[in-house]
Regions:
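Sec-dependent signal peptide cleavage junction
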Residues: 2-37
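Extracellular loop and loop/strand-boundary signature of outer-membrane beta-barrel proteins
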Residues: 50-55, 90-95, 138-145, 192-198, ...
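Residues on the lipid-exposed face of transmembrane beta-strands in outer-membrane beta-barrel proteins
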Residues: 36, 40-42, 63-71, 105-111, ...
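Membrane-embedded beta-strand positions of outer-membrane beta-barrel proteins
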Residues: 36-40, 80, 121-123, 157, ...
Length: 295
């Protein structure tokens, strides 16, 4: 019996000395959640002595990156997202041009009011990386945009409603918005609504942003965003619209088919119509097959 007692005491001390290692996959106490995806779509064709006709050579590449970092601790929430799209096309008749170019960064801090409602402050910056051109003819190009020309900076506070998982509806009745035209030739002609010679336009108005993502089934997913802005200072009835949609159909672990549809309307973007001085609804759609990697 004495021997058994001694053995039990030894085992007890050994157990007390051991520490239980935490499973690295255990995220119960993590305050940060991070992720995203990267996609790459390529296409190429070439013809030689082809009786049916067509471009002798055509090549295109489109890339997209979407990342997020969400923080939550107690009643505090901090949501950060970044979206980058770049596209390039080259063919025999038109030469090299870009067909996609944008970055969009959003940072939103919220304080929880209840399980579905936060009081939040949102910051957003949106623009492009490279020069953009109109092509009146196949050999003539006219600069119409550049890095931060236009650029949009937005700051506002309001309510962030999250009725269900993966749906966020943010509304701010008073939001400051700056339109930046950081290019001398574009600011000189008053592009994008700025006073000729000025490089910025200040706006004050109401802002709403709806963000939604869903797995339609195990192979089909959707990410959507709709931003609406009404400027109290000038023509509040002409609401600026910026909408992004992305559908992805999974083929394998790394291959997929993607379809994106973007819609933009801004009364200050007056580059269209017969005399190139009127606003229009802008649309961009891209479909492709290629690499899709979740991060």
């Amino acid at each position: 019996l004495i021997a058994q007692d001694n053995q039990a005491t030894i085992l007890k001390k050994e157990l007390e000395a051991k520490t239980i290692a935490k499973d690295p996959k255990d995220t119960a106490n993590k305050t940060w959640k991070k992720g995203g995806f990267f996609s790459l779509n390529l296409s190429q064709s070439s013809l030689s002595n082809w009786a049916a006709g067509g471009e002798d050579y055509a090549f295109s590449v489109n890339t997209a990156f979407s990342g997020f970092a969400f923080y939550k601790k107690g009643k505090h929430q901090w949501d950060n997202t970044i979206n980058i799209n770049l596209g390039y096309i080259n063919n025999t008749s038109l030469g090299a041009r870009k067909n996609d170019d944008r970055f969009d960064i959003v940072s939103k801090y919220g304080h929880e009011i209840n399980a579905k409602l936060n009081f939040s402050t949102l910051f957003n910056i949106r623009s492009q990386f490279f020069d953009g051109y109109n092509f009146p003819t196949a050999t003539t190009q006219v600069l119409n945009s550049s890095f931060m020309a236009p650029g949009y900076i937005l700051l506002g506070s309001g309510l962030d409603y999250k009725p269900v998982k993966n749906l966020s509806i943010f509304f701010s009745p008073l939001t400051a918005r700056w339109v930046i035209v950081n290019n001398d030739s574009l600011s000189k002609v008053g592009a994008y609504g700025v006073t000729p010679g000025s490089k910025s336009l200040f706006q004050l108005g109401a802002f709403a942003s709806i963000n939604y993502k869903a797995n339609i089934n195990k192979n089909v997913s959707y990410i959507g965003k709709l931003d609406l802005y009404s400027d109290y200072l000038m023509n509040p009835q002409n609401v600026a619209i910026n909408m992004n949609n992305l559908f992805a159909v999974k083929i394998s672990n790394v291959l997929s088919v993607t379809y994106s549809l973007d819609l933009i309307y801004d009364d200050n973007i007056r580059l269209f119509g017969p005399t190139k001085d009127a606003p229009r609804m802008q649309t961009k759609s891209i479909i492709g097959a290629g690499l899709l990697v979740k991060l």
